[in-house]
Regions:
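Conserved nucleotide-sugar donor-binding catalytic segment
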Residues: 79, 131-216, 220
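Conserved donor NDP-sugar-binding/catalytic core segment of glycosyltransferases
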Residues: 98-129
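Short aromatic/hydrophobic "clamp" motif used to bind/position activated sugar donors
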Residues: 86
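Acidic helix N-cap motif at the loop->helix transition within catalytic regions
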Residues: 16-18, 43-51, 94, 98
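Short loop->beta transition adjacent to catalytic acidic/histidine clusters or analogous donor-positioning motifs
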Residues: 2-4, 25-36, 44, 57-60
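Glycine-rich, basic loop-to-helix element that forms the pyrophosphate-binding segment
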Residues: 64-81, 102
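N-proximal low-complexity "stem/linker" segments adjacent to membrane-targeting elements
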Residues: 1-25
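A conserved acidic beta->alpha catalytic loop
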Residues: 23, 30, 38-47, 66-68, ...
Length: 249
């Protein structure tokens, strides 16, 4: 059974971190380590995390000296990771208990280096507020430029095939930038067509401001992906249209 390293950035996450950790502890796949990197929280997050660290040695806490943002937090955890498989779970999100077992088997049986899954949305009270969010069966680099089809909390990549791949140091859309970076190494990312995760959507979450997120996508195209103005405009128009269609749904 291969070791899975779970990458979890934490910042003022006292409301949700316990439930997040419990969803990992409930996994039917037991060979994992959870590396939680705290980005200078001022609430009781660390006390809660430390309590779990004492109960289970698979859970590790790293505290950053300076508030540095989620990309630095995730990269710090990736650097410390010992597992073959790198998985991502934010401190306010949850996994279903068969998540790792099903997705790792899917990757090993099909020789997949980069995978994701479908998911559902939950509110701040952990109540499901959406139907299953369906994803394409597979996506390549060019398709991903048109929309971020890959939710962070569902991703697992195989470091034995890809080596460790790190996030660009940007404030927002750093996960999107990482998926694009990985898709330059492999032909496709493949979807496990079953909801294996629960994405928490609430006012105050970084993902809730769509206009700001779109502006960061433009910045990603030009500064990270180095697209020409014409290509950036083409993909940005596609991104806005697809985002509008998803919003209307």
């Amino acid at each position: 059974m291969e070791l899975v390293s779970i990458i979890t950035p934490s910042y003022k996450s006292e409301r949700f971190i316990a439930e997040c950790i419990e969803s990992v502890l409930s996994q039917t796949y037991e060979n994992w380590e959870m590396i939680i990197v705290d980005d200078c929280s001022t609430d009781n997050s660390n006390e809660i995390i430390e309590m779990y660290c004492k109960k289970d040695a698979r859970i590790k806490l790293i505290q950053l000296e300076h508030n540095s943002g989620p990309a630095v937090a995730r990269n710090t955890a990736i650097k410390e990771a010992k597992g073959r498989f790198i998985a991502f779970l934010d401190a306010d999100d949850l996994w279903v208990k068969e998540k790792l077992q099903k997705q790792i088997a899917f990757m090993l049986e099909n020789d997949i280096a980069f995978s994701f899954s479908e998911y559902v949305k939950i509110d701040e009270h952990s109540q499901v507020i959406s139907e299953v969010i369906h994803r394409p069966k597979k996506v390549d680099y060019k398709r991903m430029l048109k929309s971020n089809y890959i939710p962070c909390l569902t991703v697992i990549y195989d470091s034995a095939k890809l080596s460790k791949v790190y996030m660009p140091l940007i404030l927002k859309r750093q996960d999107y930038a990482l998926w694009l970076r990985i898709l330059k190494k492999v032909d496709f990312a493949y979807c496990y067509n079953e909801p294996l995760a629960k994405y928490r959507f609430y006012s105050g979450s970084l993902s809730s401001n769509k206009f700001v997120a779109a502006m960061y996508v433009w910045k990603l195209y030009r500064e990270i992906e180095k697209l020409s103005l014409a290509k950036a405009l083409y993909y940005f128009v596609n991104y806005v249209i697809i985002s509008f269609i998803k919003y209307k749904k």
